[in-house]
């Protein structure tokens, strides 16, 4: 799909090109109380009051997300007009904009429209410019057009005809909007990879498959990939990671992916993604109902790989290292048992009280491994706890960090990217729940504050660098009729790296 940017100040009569240029449809916003947006006012004049008449007749009340096609419109180059309700003008925010953009794309994708002129990006949204509107609109469109068909014997072809979108933007934002469009496409491509990996079944997306995906990313985008096998992992003394992997016939992999966009001496940001390609719970077996969704337990790994693809396509001037410990968590005659004690790469001994708290066991060795890169920051991403889902639901990812500056950067990125996160506590008092009578630390801390104690466990392995943990158990995928991976938190991670790179 082709995206292009054209500057236009509708209030200064600069709209001639949009009024006369050929297009299948022009998208206009209408607020409640019959208020027309700037572009809608110009189109209304050119069509001799058509928009006003439609609004006054009550056919378009401006309620958020409502759409109305006006066919065979005369006086402008576009053959059709799509009116989109924006809701109340004084309540028009990021969510209202995304709702309006999504409603517009859904209406357009259900038609044979091939070329669209999109004016909503110029609407004022929380003091953001048109470039933000362009990026958000492209991501909303790509979200609507995403389909997972890899496992279908006869995939259905795309049903829409949309090929080209022309965005009208404020002239002062034109350069930034062009960059935003390129970044949005790269980001959407990264999210698509993340969603594809998550949606693949566990018998396809194995640890070896993730390793091969990393190698392909390296080949396609000029990255450097290292994929360590069982013997190399054993040589590194990653006893905690291996305690999870041991009962599966699928060999574990330890993936390290390097992107160098800055000087070699510049400290990298390290992203660590949990890669449990299927989680049965091990000996602490999960209930059968809903266990199929445990293929999504590698979404941390998928989001890290998707972010690396996006970063490489954007060409960010920053160094990034991705680390993915990946294996299955299976029961078996040689599986780790509740009460077993294992030794981590750091040397700390861990009493495994519950084998279904395995994510932290593979992440802790990866976090220790990250020390060798002398990182500027380390962010781990994991579908770590059901407790985080109970606490935050499916809207906010849980953000844990003792570093206020790093946490602030990530929260700013989450707001800019419309990829919500909420900072959770990480007080030292919670560490007491992880005490063990027999080892240095237990892998669970009981039912109270389960998401917090999981993060506290990880914090024991991150003392040498700035660190943050994102628990995406509630945001990485959706259940029910809309079941599927979401691609989150790729937007948050990518925006954080864009900000760090100053781009």
UniProtKB/Swiss-Prot annotation:
Q: Pfam families of this UniProt entry?
A: Peptidase_M17, Peptidase_M17_N
- Residues bound to Mn(2+) 1: 279, 356, 358
What is the active site of this protein?
Answer: 286, 360
Q: State the protein's purpose.
A: Presumably involved in the processing and regular turnover of intracellular proteins. Catalyzes the removal of unsubstituted N-terminal amino acids from various peptides.
**The protein's name in its UniProt record:** Probable cytosol aminopeptidase
Q: What is this enzyme's catalytic activity, as reactions?
A: Release of an N-terminal amino acid, Xaa-|-Yaa-, in which Xaa is preferably Leu, but may be other amino acids including Pro although not Arg or Lys, and Yaa may be Pro. Amino acid amides and methyl esters are also readily hydrolyzed, but rates on arylamides are exceedingly low; Release of an N-terminal amino acid, preferentially leucine, but not glutamic or aspartic acids
Q: How is its cofactor bound, per UniProt? A: Binds 2 manganese ions per subunit.
Which keywords does UniProt give here?
Aminopeptidase, Cytoplasm, Hydrolase, Manganese, Metal-binding, Protease
Q: Does the keyword Disulfide bond belong to this entry?
A: no
Give all cystine bridges in this chain: none
PROSITE patterns from the xrefs? CYTOSOL_AP (PS00631)
Query: Which gene produces this protein?
Result: pepA
Instruction: Select a single GO molecular function from the record's annotations and give it.
Output: metalloaminopeptidase activity
The UniProt similarity line reads: Belongs to the peptidase M17 family.
